[in-house]
Amino acid sequence: MLPFPAMNLKKSRSENSSVASSGSKIEEQTEKSAEPTTIKVQKKAGTPGRSIDVFAVQCEKCMKWRKIDTQDEYEDIRSRVQEDPFFCKTKEGVSCEDVGDLNYDSSRTWVIDKPGLPRTPRGFKRSLILRKDYSKMDAYYITPTGKKLKSRNEIAAFIDANQDYKYALLGDFNFTVPKVMEETVPSGILSDRTPKPSRKVTID
């Protein structure tokens, strides 16, 4: 079984208090987990969504989750995990005999990333934001100049206008987003998302 890249989100305090035994869901942060990696999401003041602040990868052999220190390292593992599987021993001083760094449970909100996605071009940053209703994540790229780009058309236009970044290949910008694992979403959020039955008026 291929290990998946994933992300983890924590809950805000208010969410923690409203969701029983939700553990570390959004607690102002969220951790990730996925097949090869996991990500943690943190709610930032003034930000309408939640962003990832923890990355993790699952060992191909023992299936334990290992935290990944940086987004760059995480993206490197994710980009080649299909040809070069991740094992606990990949991390210096770690083996399958050691206790896992994270447990896949509802104490955190997990999002599963897609293996094989390309690394973000040098100088740019890929950002993921979790929607307030936890339905999905949105992806965008931040340029070296601090501009936020939300589509490949915007990226192409930026590179055309800024030839210093022509080294960045358009194919290395990917807007595929991780899958939010619904069983790890706070129950209070799920109930809020449940559509209410419509009231039909019958006219005799």
From Swiss-Prot:
Mostly expressed in flowers and buds. Keywords: DNA-binding, Metal-binding, Nucleus, Transcription, Transcription regulation, Zinc, Zinc-finger. Residues 25-34 have a biased composition (Basic and acidic residues). Gene3D superfamilies: 3.30.40.100, Methyl-cpg-binding Protein 2, Chain A. InterPro entries: DNA-bd_dom_sf, Methyl_CpG_DNA-bd, Znf_CW. It is found in: Nucleus. A motif (MBD-associated domain (MAD)) lies at residues 58-96. Transmembrane segments: none annotated. GO terms for molecular function: methyl-CpG binding; zinc ion binding. Its main location: nucleus. One of its GO terms (cellular component) is histone deacetylase complex. Residues 15-24 have a biased composition (Polar residues). A zinc finger (CW-type) spans 49-104. Residues 110-180 form the MBD domain. Residues 1-46 are annotated as: Disordered. Zn(2+) binds at residues 59, 62, 88, 96. The methyl-CpG-binding domain (MBD) functions both in binding to methylated DNA and in protein interactions. Probable transcriptional regulator. This is Methyl-CpG-binding domain-containing protein 1. It comes from Arabidopsis thaliana (Mouse-ear cress).
